[in-house]
Amino acid sequence: IQVESTTSKGTGSGVVLRSDGYILTNNHVVAEEATSGTITVSFNGVGEVDTRADVVGLDPETDLAVIKVRGKHVLTPASLGSSGGLVVGDPVVAIGSPLGLAGTVTSGIISALNRTVRVPSETATADPTPLFNAIQTDAAINPGNSGGALVDAAGRVIGINSAIASLGATVDTQSGSIGVGFAIPIDEARSIAEQLIRTGKATHPALGVSAVTVGADGVGARGAQLKEVQPGSAAAKAGLRPGDIITKVGSKPVDSVEGLIVELRRYAVGDSVTVTYLRAKATRTARLVLQDKASA
């Protein structure tokens, strides 16, 4: 994927979702060109030509985007797997266009799961985007790989390559691979992509609170302590108050704010969920209906 605007240009990668031209990539690859730039897609294969594409939807919250090629094309969709059963040590392959070198394949393993990392923003002034629940891999990922596929040994896409950690780099500048790359799990990416194709935007379940991580130093209970509960929010309607410490969402333990976000993302807006929390050292539960973060 080649992107160009009046102020910048760059390259990225993508994953074909549907034969009629829908392609999944990263928000930070195409966001700046969504309104005033151009997006050109090049396909690897005999007889394929470069074609222009348009943005279907952007989701900065998860750093995902969907574009659609113009005209009539019959594309071969990628085979999407599941990220739910991944295990550290599983072999993986990263596919993309690092440094503009299309069709590059690198191999490695899953080094870790459930990482929280930050990726470069689409503009110099925007804050970096946090990725929650990311897959860490030592398969070489470099600038230009963003939006490309991380596949398992059977060739099924299990992640969308999105970020790297590099020596001498900050969240806004990246150097080369040192074997620490990160991908968005395909289960999350698939859900967001379906929403973007259907409505052009994505929703994100939320409680309507601000919180901080407590107990990480071994002192006191571990969890996400509420600092603010917005009036009329899902949390407020369920009786939650500032000072409450959320320790579970459903049956899953929560030991940090990041963990709370990860667990909430397993649900959809409108779902009913049970939250376990501590108030004055007493364990309580509350049933609430998740709201869209945009309205929180």
Task: Describe the function of each predicted region.
Residues 2-22, 48-54, 76-79, 105-106, ...:
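A conserved glycine-rich beta-strand in the N-terminal activation segment of trypsin-fold
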Residues 4, 19-20, 26-61, 72-74:
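Catalytic-histidine neighborhood of serine endopeptidases
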Residues 15, 22, 84, 90, ...:
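Structural motif
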Residues 54-56, 73-102, 184, 194-198, ...:
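Active-site substrate-binding loop(s) of clan PA
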Residues 2, 24-27, 87-98, 112, ...:
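Active-site-proximal beta-strands of protease catalytic cores
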Residues 70-78, 109-178, 207, 215, ...:
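Active-site region of chymotrypsin-like
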Residues 191, 195-263, 278-296:
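PDZ/PDZ-like groove recognition
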Residues 1, 37-45, 94-95, 273-277:
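Short conserved beta-strand and strand-loop elements enriched in small hydrophobics
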